[in-house]
From Swiss-Prot:
GO terms for cellular component: cytosolic small ribosomal subunit. Belongs to the universal ribosomal protein uS3 family. HAMAP family: Ribosomal_uS3_B. This is Small ribosomal subunit protein uS3. It holds the Pfam family Ribosomal_S3_C. Part of the 30S ribosomal subunit. Forms a tight complex with proteins S10 and S14. Keywords: Ribonucleoprotein, Ribosomal protein, RNA-binding, rRNA-binding. Residues 229-244 have a biased composition (Basic and acidic residues).
Length: 244
């Protein structure tokens, strides 16, 4: 089952937490859920060039707090914060609550599965060879500390008459191990031959404590360095000592 299920949903409550963090009674639950979906869809389409990793929505008492994780926060904020004020007003119009907007920078987009998938999709739309795009993404992720990565591309790859699925993997991606910190993201590339689907799994190491917030806290602290990265750091320090 670990091979088939969404790795993030599989680990909810273990080392991952929900992107919508609020409670509601039955009367207003459906309305709030639709508001969340509407806001997420709007942000992802409106800020396509800003590299949106995820949108977290929290609802304290009669308020709505939206946190956007982005690789390019400057594009969202705009000159002197003009763009972020417009975005806050548009989001406020979608909900009846007072809306607060936070922007969080993704410091390592190369090891964020959603951003990697979006990057490959953009390259396919620019007619870059899919194998080259996949290999480049894998090498960048492994260089920046990922312990393993798997990428699949499906569709009429290279303009072929028959659709097929191609995949590339490097390192370990243990989908059955619940303590594994696995990031998962998808994207669609709208090419001249049709839509190609991209899926990305990135293994960032193991989280031994039972804490639903552990994965997010680890990403925010920039503690995504795997053993390969630490080994390279040790090798660099060893060479510096030898040269000295």
């Amino acid at each position: 089952m670990g091979q088939k299920i969404n790795p993030i949903g599989f680990r909810l409550g273990i080392n991952r937490t929900w992107d919508s963090r609020w409670f509601a009674d039955n009367a207003e639950y459906g309305q709030l859920l639709h508001e969340d979906l509407k806001m997420r869809k709007f942000v992802m389409s409106e800020l396509k060039q800003a590299g949106i990793s995820k949108v977290v929505i929290e609802r304290p008492h009669k308020k709505c707090r939206v946190t956007i994780h982005s690789a390019r926060p400057g594009l969202i904020i705009g000159r002197k914060g003009a763009d972020i004020d417009k975005l806050r007003k548009k989001l406020s119009d979608m909900t009846n609550s007072e809306t607060h907007l936070n922007i969080v920078e993704v410091r390592k987009p190369e090891v964020d599965a959603t951003l990697v998938a979006q990057s490959i999709a953009q390259q396919l739309e620019r007619r870059v060879a899919f194998r080259r795009a996949m290999k480049r993404a894998v090498q960048s992720a492994m260089r920046l500390g990922a312990e393993g990565i798997k990428i699949t591309c499906a569709g009429r790859l290279g303009g072929a008459e028959i659709a097929r699925t191609e995949w590339y993997r490097e390192g370990r991606v243990p989908l059955h191990t619940l303590r594994a910190d696995i990031d998962y993201g998808t994207a669609e590339a709208e090419t001249a031959f049709g839509i190609c689907g991209i899926k990305v799994w990135i293994f960032k190491g193991e989280i031994l404590e039972h804490d639903p917030m552990a994965s997010e806290r680890r990403a925010l602290e920039g503690d995504a360095q795997g053993p390969a990265s630490r080994e390279r750091d040790r090798g660099d320090r060893r060479r510096e000592r030898d040269n000295a």
